[in-house]
A protein has these predicted regions:
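N-terminal capping/linker segments that flank leucine-rich repeat
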Residues: 5-78, 95, 116, 153-160, ...
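Conserved hydrophobic beta-strand positions in leucine-rich repeat
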Residues: 55-59, 79-81, 98-102, 119-123, ...
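The feature encodes a structural signal of leucine-rich repeats
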Residues: 67-71, 86-92, 107-113, 128-134, ...
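Residue-level detector of functionally pivotal "anchor" positions at catalytic/ligand-binding pockets or at interdomain
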Residues: 201-229
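Consensus "Asn ladder" position of solenoid repeat domains
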Residues: 62, 84, 105, 126, ...
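C-terminal tail/sorting-segment detector
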Residues: 237-252
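Conserved hydrophobic position(s) of the canonical leucine-rich repeat
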Residues: 54, 76, 86, 97, ...
């Protein structure tokens, strides 16, 4: 009976004390200064209960290099994180996200595929090389100007809702997968939304992909969603130590 009572007394403490790991000092300091921390400066943690109901987060121009910990913001709808030093952005746990603004970083990999309610995305001036929005059928605004795109899949079954789409200044991007190539050509070209070498297709081929020189060190291999993988027989991105990205398929 005493053991049972002790367990019951500890449960509220355990629930209240759940922590989220936030390794970036500038990100943690912002959360601490704005009532979203655990009261302990520079310990790399914040109290989960203080962030999981936050609706809007604005960390623009905070010199942040990592947003690890953003997964604890499960109620987040609006995220503003532009003008930082982010190299990747994993929003796979932020399923309620509706608006994302992350321009002027050096983001190479990004994942908001689980954010099925997302409507507005601005990721211009980054290094994103692959993006698949096939699960984001409510998207109405997509800004990807000045990135490093090799692959872009806009085939989400609702392209007519995407009334603003811009992917200019992506010299490595040629074929863009869409629901209806004729509709896309007639609607998205009008406002010079794509580069001259880019075109829309219902079925972009994954064969005959341009291969770059491999006389350099491979840092990691990712799939089309930016996830590290060792699987073959699918389009993969090889990321090298000089910043180059090579796209190819290994058949086994």
């Amino acid at each position: 009976m005493k053991k049972l009572l002790l367990i019951l007394l500890c449960l509220p403490i355990i629930g209240f004390g759940q922590q989220t790991y936030v390794p970036d000092d500038n990100f943690e300091n912002y959360l601490e200064a704005n009532g979203m921390g655990n009261g302990i400066a520079n310990d790399d943690y914040v109290t989960t209960a203080s962030i999981n109901t936050i609706n809007t987060l604005n960390v623009n121009n905070m010199n942040i290099a990592s947003l690890v910990g953003i997964e604890g913001f499960i109620g987040l709808k609006y995220l503003y994180c532009g003008l930082n030093q982010l190299t990747s952005l994993d929003l796979s746990n932020n399923i309620n996200l509706e608006n994302l603004h992350c321009p002027e970083n050096t983001i190479a990999t990004i994942d908001f595929s689980n954010s099925v309610s997302i409507m507005h995305v601005n990721c211009e001036n980054n290094q994103i090389y692959s993006l698949d929005i096939s699960q984001n059928s409510l998207l109405g605004h997509l800004e990807l100007k000045d990135n490093n795109l090799f692959y872009l899949n806009l085939k989400n079954g609702a392209n007519t809702l995407l009334n603003h789409m811009r992917v200019t200044d992506n010299p490595n991007l040629t074929c863009i997968s869409v629901d209806d190539s004729l509709w896309a050509t007639n609607n998205w070209n009008v406002f010079q939304d794509i580069d001259p070498q880019q075109y829309f297709s219902n079925n972009c081929s994954t064969t005959g992909i341009e291969e770059l020189s491999t006389n350099k060190k491979i840092l990691k291999v990712t799939d089309l969603l930016g996830r590290e993988t060792k699987q073959t027989n699918q389009p993969l991105f090889y990321i090298y130590d000089d910043g180059a990205v090579e796209k190819k398929i290994v058949i086994e």
